[in-house]
């Protein structure tokens, strides 16, 4: 009998088990497409980022001009930059949908996969933050100043830590060069973590919309889901290219077209849209250390999801009370995102505080209560 290389070769066997013969539940919906879309986002960002890095100069006197030079004088440099900048937005759209899917369908009960996923989110946020500093515009500079300054709230070691991160007494050339080094390194850390994420996922297999074991009815990944994934790729790339070609600056801040000036503070310092929910939570607490802790908690609370699961059912498919809470949480996050983009004045302050309070209340208090209530309803 002829040797089947795909199933016997040490390297091809790994690829085969992950992408071709992988047993997959037959009923997973389009919400399960976002994992592979994140893979495409990562590849796109690494390729465009590498091309940008070949023309970029990480020096305070040259960074802004090197980006302008790229957009004007490099073949398709404008397109590569627009794809990279907007690709970051799509990366976050996909990861938020991916996390939302995991939360809705109880995928967090695959604890290792979920925890690695949260670490991936934190790494992605760090990568996006240091990347935003590189063009050295006004919002790059002041964003870096404000966010790195938050570490000074840490008791005793805070100020030392911040000056160590800056490489001086303010955000300056050493900060820019190390941020460029980190921005180059972290995507490869993300690639490594992604492989670990997939390894843990394939230990248990994918969850499905019903939240029940599906071993009795699984189908091979290829050709069924490989085809479905390609449709997802096409749709996302069409949207990304459309945004990059028709409205590349839609999601950016006009302030970043002005070179960084340490002597002039922009009227409203705010991060990119994908950090606004966390920024709103940070601002809603009128104490520096308290705000920093709330900011950290807003993302780290995801680690608690498996511990807060009190329901006898895995997914929210048949849990109407928890469904209402889930969509209230989504609406709450949209409100936080909007408030984060507004100036710190009435009525935005109180709206932000109420939204921040309800964010933590829904996740930490109401979800477990609803689950216990639904368990009791099952006995009626």
Swiss-Prot record:
SUPFAM superfamilies documented for this protein: a domain/subunit of cytochrome bc1 complex (Ubiquinol-cytochrome c reductase), Transmembrane di-heme cytochromes
Binding-site residues, heme b b562: 84, 183
PROSITE patterns linked: CYTB_CTER, CYTB_NTER
GO BP term (any one): mitochondrial electron transport, ubiquinol to cytochrome c
Entry note: cofactor: Binds 2 heme b groups non-covalently.
Membrane-crossing segments per the record: 34-54, 78-99, 114-134, 179-199, 227-247, 289-309, 321-341, 348-368
Cofactor(s) recorded in Swiss-Prot or TrEMBL: heme b
Family assignment from sequence similarity: Belongs to the cytochrome b family.
Name of the protein in question: Cytochrome b
Gene from which this protein is expressed: MT-CYB
């Amino acid at each position: 009998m002829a040797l089947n290389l795909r199933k016997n070769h040490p390297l091809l066997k790994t690829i085969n088990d992950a992408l071709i013969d992988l047993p997959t539940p037959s009923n997973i919906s389009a919400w399960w497409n976002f994992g592979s879309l994140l893979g495409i986002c990562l590849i796109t960002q690494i390729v465009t980022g590498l091309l940008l890095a070949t023309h970029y100069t990480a020096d305070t006197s040259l960074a802004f001009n090197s980006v302008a030079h790229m957009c004007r004088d490099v073949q398709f440099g404008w397109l590569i930059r627009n794809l990279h900048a907007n690709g970051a937005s799509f990366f976050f759209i996909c990861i938020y949908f991916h996390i939302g899917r995991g939360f809705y369908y109880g995928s967090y009960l695959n604890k290792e996969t979920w925890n690695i996923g949260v670490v991936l989110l934190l790494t992605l946020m760090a990568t996006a933050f240091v990347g935003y500093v590189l063009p050295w515009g006004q919002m790059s500079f002041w964003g870096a100043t404000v966010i790195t300054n938050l570490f000074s709230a840490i008791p005793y070691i805070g100020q030392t830590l911040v000056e160590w991160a800056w490489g001086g007494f303010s955000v300056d050339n050493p900060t820019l060069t190390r941020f460029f080094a980190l921005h180059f390194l972290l995507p490869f850390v993300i690639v490594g973590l992604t492989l670990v994420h997939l390894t843990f996922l394939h230990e248990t297999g994918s969850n499905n919309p019903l939240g029940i074991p599906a071993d009795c009815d699984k189908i091979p990944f290829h050709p069924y889901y490989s085809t479905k994934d390609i449709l997802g790729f096409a749709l996302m790339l069409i949207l990304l290219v459309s945004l990059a070609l028709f409205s590349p600056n839609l999601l950016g801040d006009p302030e970043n077209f002005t070179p960084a000036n340490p002597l002039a503070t922009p009227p409203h310092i705010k991060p990119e849209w994908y950090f606004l929910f966390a920024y709103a939570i940070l601002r809603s607490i009128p104490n520096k250390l308290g705000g920093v802790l709330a900011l950290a908690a807003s993302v780290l609370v995801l680690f608690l999801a498996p511990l807060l699961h009190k329901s006898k059912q895995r997914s929210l498919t048949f849990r109407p009370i928890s469904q209402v809470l889930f969509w209230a949480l989504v609406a709450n996050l949209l409100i936080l995102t909007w408030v984060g983009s507004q100036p710190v004045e009435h009525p935005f302050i109180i709206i932000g505080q109420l939204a921040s309070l309800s964010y933590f209340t829904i996740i930490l208090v109401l979800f477990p209560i609803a689950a216990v209530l639904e368990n009791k309803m099952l006995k009626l």
